[in-house]
């Protein structure tokens, strides 16, 4: 724990937004020499498997960000027939029941649904006995996010905030981390009731985006986007792409009707998982 504190302490002191803006600038630079240098060294450092990428040649990407949100060959991530599939490549940070409106962040650390969604008590009440899964995407992972279940898009809320790292060491130290960082809460209707996918930003995450909106512009104020009226792409099928991170972060998945969701018993905190793998059955 002391080692985690030492790793995390500098994050309270550094200009996280400034560093993130600078990293985002360089990640969009299209200079062949610079972008090839960044991509080549990233692949080497994180042992990225380019054989899975739809475009295998690192030099074929226009900039680092294009490489980072690269598409995978469809056959590399077949979709299971499970009721609920994993929406990302990553690692399960925590998974389980929402207890009296509280989600487990790490051992001994909790945060509330209302804090996470920056919503009123009436909306948060829907999830008070729900189910949740927190999925961490490491730098080497595929960074597009897909739908875990067929759903209808209802609304989206951009919530400004801090940009702490979301690495495991930080989650064990920083209180209410996912409710403090910049994030995008996306609300859906499913056959078993409300579902929310929260895409959490972090240090050096240049942008969070969705398939219907593109990059969501960073702002100082909370912004809501309503899709309850006529919208061409409201229905999004299981496995379809719904968003992306320009540099890695975390997805928090919430289901309101907890009694309907039975998580796969093999899924525990620390488990590695890939897009399309079974996550839960609907009871």
Curated annotation (Swiss-Prot):
UniProt xrefs under InterPro entries: PS_Dcarbxylase (IPR003817), PSD-B (IPR033177), PSD_type1_pro (IPR033178)
One GO cellular component, as annotated: plasma membrane
Keyword Hydrolase attached: no
Site-annotated residues for Cleavage (non-hydrolytic): 248-249
Chief location bin: membrane
EC numbers on record: 4.1.1.65
Active-site residues annotated for this sequence: 89 (charge relay system), 146 (charge relay system), 249 (charge relay system), 249 (schiff-base intermediate with substrate)
Listed pathway(s): Phospholipid metabolism; phosphatidylethanolamine biosynthesis; phosphatidylethanolamine from CDP-diacylglycerol: step 2/2
Gene Ontology biological process: phosphatidylethanolamine biosynthetic process
Reported modifications of this chain: Is synthesized initially as an inactive proenzyme. Formation of the active enzyme involves a self-maturation process in which the active site pyruvoyl group is generated from an internal serine residue via an autocatalytic post-translational modification. Two non-identical subunits are generated from the proenzyme in this reaction, and the pyruvate is formed at the N-terminus of the alpha chain, which is derived from the carboxyl end of the proenzyme.
Cofactors required: pyruvate
GO molecular function: phosphatidylserine decarboxylase activity
Keywords: Cell membrane, Decarboxylase, Lipid biosynthesis, Lipid metabolism, Lyase, Membrane, Phospholipid biosynthesis, Phospholipid metabolism, Pyruvate, Zymogen
Membrane topology: Peripheral membrane protein
Family: Belongs to the phosphatidylserine decarboxylase family. PSD-B subfamily. Prokaryotic type I sub-subfamily.
Full protein name: Phosphatidylserine decarboxylase proenzyme
Organism whose genome encodes this protein: Legionella pneumophila (strain Corby)
Source taxonomy: Bacteria, Pseudomonadati, Pseudomonadota, Gammaproteobacteria, Legionellales
Name of the gene encoding the protein in the UniProt record: psd
């Amino acid at each position: 724990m002391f080692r985690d504190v030492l790793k995390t302490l500098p994050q309270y002191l550094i200009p996280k937004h400034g560093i993130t803006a600078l990293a985002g600038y360089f990640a969009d630079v299209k200079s062949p020499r610079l972008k090839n240098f960044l991509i080549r060294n990233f692949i080497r450092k994180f042992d990225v498997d380019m054989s899975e990428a739809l475009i295998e040649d690192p030099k074929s990407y226009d900039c680092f960000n294009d490489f980072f949100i690269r598409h995978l060959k469809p056959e590399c991530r077949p979709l299971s027939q499970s009721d609920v599939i994993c929406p990302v490549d990553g690692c399960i940070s925590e998974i389980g029941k929402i207890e009296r409106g509280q989600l487990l962040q790490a051992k001994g650390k909790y945060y509330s649904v209302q804090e996470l969604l920056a919503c009123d008590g009436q909306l948060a009440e829907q999830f008070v006995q729900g189910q949740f899964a927190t999925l961490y995407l490491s730098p080497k992972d595929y960074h597009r996010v897909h739908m875990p279940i067929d759903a209808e898009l209802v609304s989206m809320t951009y919530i400004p905030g801090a940009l702490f790292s979301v690495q495991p060491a930080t989650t064990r130290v920083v209180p209410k981390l996912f409710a403090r960082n910049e994030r995008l809460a996306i609300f859906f209707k499913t056959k078993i009731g409300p579902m929310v996918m929260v895409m959490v930003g972090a240090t050096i995450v240049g942008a969070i985006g969705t398939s219907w909106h593109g990059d969501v512009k960073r702002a100082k104020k909370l912004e809501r986007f309503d899709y309850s009226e006529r919208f061409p792409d409201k229905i999004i099928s299981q496995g379809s792409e719904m968003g992306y991170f320009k540099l890695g972060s975390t997805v928090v998945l919430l289901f309101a009707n907890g009694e309907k969701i039975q998580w796969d018993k093999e899924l525990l905190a620390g488990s590695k998982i890939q897009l399309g793998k079974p996550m839960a059955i609907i009871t």
